[in-house]
Amino acid sequence: GEMVRPGVTTKQIDKAVYEFILSQGAKPTFLGYGGFPASTCISVNEVIIHGIPGNRVLKEGDIVSVDVGATWGGFTGDCAATFACGKISEQAQKLITVTEQSFYEGIKFARQGYRISDIGHAVQTYVESQGFGVVRAFVGHGVGEKMHEEPEVPNFGSPGRGPRMVKGMTLAIEPMVTQGSYEVRVLKDKWTTVTADGKLAAHYENSILITDGEPEILTVTEGL
């Protein structure tokens, strides 16, 4: 997060994260995953997810989502947050704040005995009450020995559906929120996913553990 500032390239951020992950004795999960060429996904402005780090220079007013996966001791953690690059618009800041808060609204229902869709219902209800859209084309997921495991965890839908959560489950909860329409488009590189209307998007994610009480957050995205 501290590296998100005007004049920095997305590739420089990726390199710093790569070196940090290795310094902790972990492996960057994304690197080579499905052929992905980097250790992080860095998604700027209208890019929602899966932005490929490169020579793009960040500028004042950009919003920048950094998504990171690391594998250590056989377990994979997946997390993301969206950061302001310098001074951003009030509406862009609201989008970032609502996206992060929607994660916390969702995990109020990430408890033993509740159903998976209770999380997404809470996320969608909160996000839409704030005037934003929730991406449907991509969802959260189970996480553990592999990065993507069952069950899928949508950020939308009716409550009371899907498997019941049980103690010991590990889930990646990741609201992807748009300023306008929730429709998306994947670019020719087959990775970069943008809002169809070109408006801003934000992403926030942590991996959590279902316990017999409140869920435990396993990844900490503050400052990433």
PLM features: residue spans?
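Active-site neighborhoods and metal-handling regions in enzymes and metal-associated proteins
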Residues: G1-L224
